[in-house]
Amino acid sequence: MSRQWMTLMAILLVYIPVAIDATVLHVAAPTLSVALGSSGNELLWIIDIYSLVMAGMVLPMGALGDKIGFKRLLLLGSAIFGIASLCAALSPTAMTLIASRALLAVGAAMIVPATLAGIRSTFAEASQRNMALGLWAAVGSGGAAFGPLVGGILLEHFYWGSVFLINVPIVLVVIAINAKVVPRQPARREQPLNLLQALVLIAAILMLVFSAKSALKGQLALWLTALVALGGAAMLTWFIRKQLSAARPMVDMRLFTHRIILSGVMMAMTALITLVGFELLMAQELQFVHQKTPFEAGIFMLPVMVASGFSGPIAGLLVSRLGLREVATGGMLLSAFSFLGLALTDFSTQQWLAWGLMTLLGFSVASALLASSSAIMAAAPKEKAAAAGAIETMAYELGAGLGIALFGLILTRSYSASIALPSGLSGAMAQQAASSIGEAVSLSQALPAGVAQALMTAAKTAFIQAHSLVLATAGVLLLLLAAGIWRSLATVAKPQSAL
């Protein structure tokens, strides 16, 4: 095997745990809720802190790779990822797990741009580079697709920390391989890092998400929630002004003035919001309501994961044949149809219908993602292709984080409003049971059998009602977005084969 392909193999090995870690916790949510005694709000932070931190860190980490060389960045990111995985596996509380997940995101934000830079540096010939990038994309989509299944297998046989602990030996092996196989690159000391701007962006995102969660759950005083929101908005405003005035901005904000690029960003964020939010919702319903094990839940969700992970080539062919506008709008419409159908589906008695709709959802989301990439890269000037790609990466990560937050908030709000609590619960118990189905499960274990059974029946009924409302709401919003996308992409020319 040539040195080039050995380098690629080493790079892909370190990317595998990063890709899996993006989705591995989806089926672990119910287990974490019980094992750590985490509230519904803490559970959402455990899962979405990874994507939200990564969204703000991936751009400056790319600049750090240019400054110190991608090999050093790859090794440093792998070491941080391994240490954070060990900390996460041994976390005694929800707060320490949230902090460990944030550190995991920092390591992942180093690894992802380092792997891409490594491929660009290793393969000078375009055909070989495209093949290498295709393999990289396959590892990313495949890892994310099978992450919940891997998590289910581990949780079936080991304790919850195993979903993180498995990363440690993998990281040790890939560090040794990369240190030996990957060639060293010259450093570019003049490359700016913009680390302060990245930290401000992360703080702004977290403060805005925190204030939104607090406002919906009513956990903080209104004035304090408003103060946090204003602080986040002020930081975001400062960040945007800094980007507009900088000679070499971290994010080229002027690209957002292009209607087609803005449409592409909206499609990318929406596709990830719906896909990741749906997977989290499904994982909880399958385990809490339908009593499936984590592995069984992972198997049940396999159609949407496989379809979304491996439909890219088909979607690319459709864009070439039908046109960007048609595929983008069609993807949104099919996603809306899937959500509206799933909102009316009984997962316990209509499994084949659920799997069919989930497969359609996965394919339509993949089509929307491919269309978003095509829109962004086709509309961006050549000299700003890298900046446009960076914006797309941020849109993916923000979409994943916001999907968990938005679906989780709407689900929690609807569940709390619709649960009909049985008699025999104190005020504190009633408040706990109404906060989330995970809290209801924890509480039921300490109640008399009759009251516990009545509570779980009420909790399951409320969750199913909330699930239907969330999916129906997502379906309606996607219909509205499809109309907007059809209008905004009206100026995009059809390919010759479609004429």
Q: How should these model regions be labeled?
A:
Residues 63-196:
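Helix-loop-helix hairpins in multi-pass membrane proteins, especially solute transporters
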Residues 37, 69, 90-96, 158-159, ...:
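Helix-breaking motifs and short loop linkers at transmembrane-helix boundaries and internal kinks
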